[in-house]
Amino acid sequence: MIKFLSALILLLVITAAQAERIRDLTSVQGVRQNSLIGYGLVVGLDGTGDQTTQTPFTTQTLNNMLSQLGITVPTGTNMQLKNVAAVMVTASLPPFGRQGQTIDVVVSSMGNAKSLRGGTLLMTPLKGVDSQVYALAQGNILVGGAGASAGGSSVQVNQLNGGRITNGAVIERELPSQFGVGNTLNLQLNDEDFSMAQQIADTINRVRGYGSATALDARTIQVRVPSGNSSQVRFLADIQNMQVNVTPQDAKVVINSRTGSVVMNREVTLDSCAVAQGNLSVTVNRQANVSQPDTPFGGGQTVVTPQTQIDLRQSGGSLQSVRSSASLNNVVRALNALGATPMDLMSILQSMQSAGCLRAKLEII
């Protein structure tokens, strides 16, 4: 009976633990994307391009491009173009990208163009931080937004000054890679955690032998690998598919001060406390009054005098009791019972943490 209970308890503990693959928790150091950027022109717009009188760089770029094609524009020519726009083009060079491989690009207007819908990006070199050209971009732009205007009225859905070209750039230069050089590789945790780093190292050592992996710090695990690209690929494939029991995360509440959004994980708990939140509202009313002379022939003139009225109201918040909560559902239910807006909730959570009632780290972004 005792053995059965022990086995049952062990089974419950193992079931409660959440297992994840090492590939979902880590990344290989040095295997990363690299940002590319370029400046180009979009043509073929339906009268929604840059106003060239206000964006002289668009005209200058067009003149330079035409001169490279053997077309000379007379000096002093004032070109009134509406179907051309100057844009910035960005892309990410993937790890192990090879010549001839295509990547997606994002096109964004940098002038006063109204829309890039229906436009075509002309050949644009994409450079890295070393000013070397790694890809060439060109193609038709796909804009996700929509808009129309007529008679002084307009309507717009989403953004029209940016778009995307799927497979719009071709890689022309490869980045040198250090993969396969040396007998060690570093795995980097997505989030720093000493216990998780040690647990991953222990899992690799159990399967590959003691000394195969060492946790260097809270984010880095050094792994001994065989030499050669093909051997390291097979070795990493086996390691990344190993299962690791994920320990509970640190309780954390993230507050976005710009949008007022509040996000918390399931480890957040509350202690018993009492909360009172008062609302302060300020109302400003401004009205223009017309003052005229009493008699039409008595002199004077008609003037407009503004009248401003400011009202200040503060509604007293009642003291609300918040019970101790051990689960995320209970925490959400307790906070909703306060009836506070997201902006009020930010102040309440900060005060709760200062009072020691919020058992979590508070991060404001």
Swiss-Prot record:
Record-annotated membrane-spanning stretches: none
Keywords: Bacterial flagellum, Periplasm, Signal
Residues in the signal sequence: 1-19
Disulfide bonds: none
One term of GO molecular function: structural molecule activity
A GO CC annotation given for this chain: outer membrane-bounded periplasmic space
InterPro entries given in the database record: Flag_FlgI
Compartment(s) where it occurs, according to its Swiss-Prot or TrEMBL record: Periplasm; Bacterial flagellum basal body
Keyword check for Signal: yes
GO biological process, one term: bacterial-type flagellum-dependent cell motility
Pfam families: FlgI
Quaternary organization: The basal body constitutes a major portion of the flagellar organelle and consists of four rings (L,P,S, and M) mounted on a central rod.
Sequence similarity: Belongs to the FlgI family.
PANTHER family linked: FLAGELLAR P-RING PERIPLASMIC PROTEIN FLGI (PTHR30381), FLAGELLAR P-RING PROTEIN (PTHR30381:SF0)
Job of this protein: Assembles around the rod to form the L-ring and probably protects the motor/basal body from shearing forces during rotation.
Record protein name field: Flagellar P-ring protein
Organism: Escherichia coli O127:H6 (strain E2348/69 / EPEC)
